[in-house]
Amino acid sequence: MPVNPKDRYDAMTDYLGRVGQFGPCMMRCSASTQVSIDYVDERDSIEKLRLGTVIGPILAYFFRNTPYFEGEKNPWPLLRQRMWDYLDFQRTNVLPGLFDPRYGWEDYAIDVLSTPLMFADLTHTPEAVASGATPKELHRPAFRENAGEVYPDRELNPYEINHIISTHFNDVRLKNFIELRHWDSLPIERAERLTEIVSSLFYVPEHRDRLESYFEGISEEEVFEAKANIQAHGREATPYGQPLHFWKEFLGLEGLLSDIPGDPKHPDVFQE
């Protein structure tokens, strides 16, 4: 299956095709539904990053849409998570250190700046453009170099910052908004319902307060355990020590529209 004919995707195919179990598959068969939410300041953003990371896998289970994979019945309850979690740990999965009480924007910046870029985009870097670099030199693989080695030692401009962040694919990603990335590609009606649920959980104060109180003090290790628990046990899973029917009620997961086919070309196929 071909990908968009861009230098970036050529580099990603080359790099990610050599790491993890599902590098080539990630770019070709892990389409997603992503929901973005706003934040007002650093503290608000960190709290939402944590909450989104904690509940994302549970929502992913109730909105999963991958009954088949490569012509066979899909063996993983959360296939998209399985692909990404084992892809390239330095740029996927849970943000490292997120659940440390001291975690802040500086820690996020250190993480994205110190990881090999995978692909360098210097098309909006004045120093590189002025040097007479060719188009291929401005758009090139960077499998070993991190941002500090590629970009000039100055305050980065918005384009450069956005590019660096875009080379990370964590479960929840921080930009000038928060990007929740856990979920399978969904038919539009189910994507709208998922967005309604996310909005309710994050924007209705009593709902958010209840979640933050329940998960107060949770650790990174507990999140990893919950994700693995769902993968190992499916409908019998007990993420964070509670069965899935508890989470369905606690998170207000009503009207999930699971009777809508996941693919209109196959109206008789549903997620079990």
What are these regions (language model features)?
Residues 37, 46, 55-58, 110, ...:
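Weak global preference for isoleucine
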Residues 251-272:
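Eukaryote-biased recognition of C-terminal alpha-helical segments
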Residues 171-173, 178-254, 258:
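Substrate-recognition/cap regions that form aromatic- and gly/pro-loop-enriched pockets
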Residues 1-173:
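Loop-rich catalytic cores of soluble enzymes, especially ATP-dependent carboxylate-amine ligases
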Residues 6, 155, 159, 163, ...:
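Low-complexity, intrinsically disordered regions enriched in charged/polar residues
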